[in-house]
């Protein structure tokens, strides 16, 4: 269970990074 939670957090982190890149650096 913990492993899947960590994997989900990593996926969320990538999505968050993409969102930051899009919003701040205009890299969409």
From Swiss-Prot:
Family: Belongs to the frog skin active peptide (FSAP) family. Brevinin subfamily.
Disulfide bridge positions per record: 22-28
Organism annotation: Lithobates palustris (Pickerel frog)
InterPro entries cross-referenced by the UniProt entry: Antimicrobial_frog_2 (IPR012521)
GO CC term (a single one): extracellular region
Job description of the protein: Antimicrobial activity against Gram-negative bacterium E.coli.
Record keyword Secreted present: yes
This protein's name: Palustrin-1a
Keyword line: Amphibian defense peptide, Antibiotic, Antimicrobial, Disulfide bond, Secreted
Lineage, highest ranks first: Eukaryota, Metazoa, Chordata, Craniata, Vertebrata
Pfam families registered for this protein in UniProt: Antimicrobial_2 (PF08023)
Primary location class: secreted
Single biological process term from Gene Ontology: defense response to Gram-negative bacterium
Subcellular location: Secreted
Transmembrane segments: none
Tissue: Expressed by the skin glands.
């Amino acid at each position: 269970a913990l492993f899947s939670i960590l994997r989900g957090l990593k996926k969320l982190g990538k999505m968050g990074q993409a969102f930051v890149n899009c919003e701040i650096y205009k890299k969409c």
